[in-house]
């Protein structure tokens, strides 16, 4: 993966797994039984998200780096 998107990983008691969200890519998220598994799955889904957007002719946001919160 050459794009550096922010990935937020948190524990979900409801899903009993770690959830990885990619805020810059709408709907891009993954999960895993471990933190590392969630991260690996997120990296894979980012690539798939970009491939799908490219095939559909949709714009691909550039990574913004670290998101700032007020």
Residue ranges and their predicted role:
Residues 26-37:
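A short, exposed loop/beta-hairpin motif centered on an aromatic-Gly-Thr core
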Residues 10-25:
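Short aromatic-glycine-(Arg/Gly/Cys) micro-motifs in beta-strand/loop hairpins
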Residues 1-6, 15, 40-70:
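Short, charged, surface-exposed hinge/linker loops at domain edges
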């Amino acid at each position: 993966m050459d794009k550096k998107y922010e990935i937020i990983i948190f524990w979900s008691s409801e899903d009993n797994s770690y959830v990885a969200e990619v805020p810059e890519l709408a709907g891009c998220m993954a999960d895993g039984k471990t933190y590392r598994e969630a991260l690996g799955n997120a990296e894979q889904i980012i690539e798939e998200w970009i491939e799908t957007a490219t095939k559909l002719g949709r714009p691909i946001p550039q990574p913004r780096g670290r998101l700032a919160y007020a």
